[in-house]
Amino acid sequence: MKLLVVDLKSKWCVIVLILFYISLVLFVSFVGVSSFYPGRLDGIYTGVSHNFVPFATIGTYLFNIHSYNFDTWFYNTFGMVLLFIPIGVLIPLLLPKLKNALTIVLILMFSLTIESVQYVTQLGVFDVDDIMLNSLGGLIGILVFSYLKRKRLFN
């Protein structure tokens, strides 16, 4: 029984969803980050503004879970994955003929752009682990889209 058959052939609907999604990601990445680093927007934050070592941040959060409140821990681990699941669904909806490998490259470039702008503007922390977690989220989104397409929930 197909209760959720969605006809998303209208590119307009997908474009609006993507624009809303990008706005949300930019808000979380730049405006929302000030709640994690008080004073950042005033230019007085003096903490580390980058991590170029793969798995350093992930390891810190996973092996020192007791040192962080749940919100901080969740945002910096699972939140980074969850944030990018929608783009893994939306790109194939907008560009159905695009190969999955190219979709992953677009997701990687989107994440790298956000992290680079955070580094340059100092409105966040450039973290290679965020790029890895974001890419994992995008990949999960691609897999979800593929599953839903096979089940014919998307036309």
Can you say where each PLM-predicted feature lies in the sequence?
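Bulky hydrophobic segments
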Residues: M1-L123, I142, S146-N155
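Alpha-helical transmembrane segments that form the membrane-embedded catalytic/substrate-binding core
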Residues: V125-F145
